[in-house]
Amino acid sequence: MACSHQKNEQMRVGKPKWLRRSLPTGPEYEKIRTLLKGSGLTTVCQEAQCPNQFECYSKGTATFMIMGDHCTRNCRFCAVAHGPKALPDEDEAERVADAVSLLGLRYAVITSVTRDDLADGGASCFVRVIEAIRKKNPKTLIEVLIPDLAGNWGALQTILDARPDVLNHNIETVPRLYSVARPGAEYRRSLELLREVRRRAPQMVTKTGMMLGLGEETEELYATWQDLRESDCDILTMGQYLQPTVDHLLVQRFVEPTEFDRLGDVALAKDFLAVASGPFVRSSYEAEKLFRKAELARK
């Protein structure tokens, strides 16, 4: 498939009917939104305009983005702003832990912008948040969705020593598309990170996610899954890429729900322990359910 990834000035392609979903509304959602706004926290659910956010909240799951809302990289698919970085907030860990308590979360996902400007890539910030949640919410499961830490495996070990329940690092797309979609990232480095997690923490549940519709070919997907399984990755999520603004990469195609179902079945046959595949699937979608499946499959 031809792939026109040049900076575009045309309007975004209209969504097919299966991708039209209203953003959440109603008193319960407003209660949660007000609570999060009052805490001064950033959730990926709201920052990325995720259509699943209220569904996840109702299932006791939320994703918090730490270390600010500006990234040192400028991935062409991502809605997170690129620009000046603030110093990490020393009170952030306690505020996240408080929000987990107030929301009554059973499962908390902690992610971050990429902070190449910090010596440890923000590893110590992840640790502080994990420890604060565990102190106030000992029964809450914790998943960390981490950047590649610029290949700093000492920083990775710092996070692993805090013993999150799931270590997630998104491969995002096939290697051919990295130069246009993920400048500053390296496909092999992401695979190596997942391998390092397995080597350093053999019992850790590992996870990755991909966006479809950027111009990848089916055979490239299969090859990427094989690379992920050779890196001993347990869980795979796949969802439709949606162009955040006209300045981001164009959607090359909309993958139909039936094809997502088929691809999910093929991925499971590659021996992933759990797979979520669908147009609205995002990295933390049904996160607790996928973790439970993987945990059960490993026994």
Curated annotation (Swiss-Prot):
Domain called Radical SAM core: residue spans: 57-273
Subcellular location: Cytoplasm
Class in the EC hierarchy, top level: transferase
GO MF term (any one): 4 iron, 4 sulfur cluster binding
SUPFAM superfamilies in UniProt: Radical SAM enzymes (SSF102114)
Pfam families per UniProt: LIAS_N, Radical_SAM
Cofactor comment: Binds 2 [4Fe-4S] clusters per subunit. One cluster is coordinated with 3 cysteines and an exchangeable S-adenosyl-L-methionine.
Binding site for [4Fe-4S] cluster 1: C45, C50, C56, S284
Alphabetically ordered keywords of this record: 4Fe-4S, Cytoplasm, Iron, Iron-sulfur, Metal-binding, S-adenosyl-L-methionine, Transferase
Keyword Heme: no
Superkingdom as given in the UniProt entry: Bacteria
Cofactors: [4Fe-4S] cluster
Stored PROSITE patterns: RADICAL_SAM
Record field: transmembrane: none
Pathway: Protein modification; protein lipoylation via endogenous pathway; protein N(6)-(lipoyl)lysine from octanoyl-[acyl-carrier-protein]: step 2/2
Binding site residues for [4Fe-4S] cluster 2: C71, C75, C78
GO CC term (a single one): cytoplasm
EC number, UniProt record: 2.8.1.8
Catalytic activity, reaction form: [[Fe-S] cluster scaffold protein carrying a second [4Fe-4S](2+) cluster] + N(6)-octanoyl-L-lysyl-[protein] + 2 oxidized [2Fe-2S]-[ferredoxin] + 2 S-adenosyl-L-methionine + 4 H(+) = [[Fe-S] cluster scaffold protein] + N(6)-[(R)-dihydrolipoyl]-L-lysyl-[protein] + 4 Fe(3+) + 2 hydrogen sulfide + 2 5'-deoxyadenosine + 2 L-methionine + 2 reduced [2Fe-2S]-[ferredoxin]
Recorded family membership: Belongs to the radical SAM superfamily. Lipoyl synthase family.
NCBIfam families registered for this protein in UniProt: lipA, PRK05481.1, PRK12928.1
Protein name: Lipoyl synthase
The species this protein was found in: Desulfotalea psychrophila (strain LSv54 / DSM 12343)
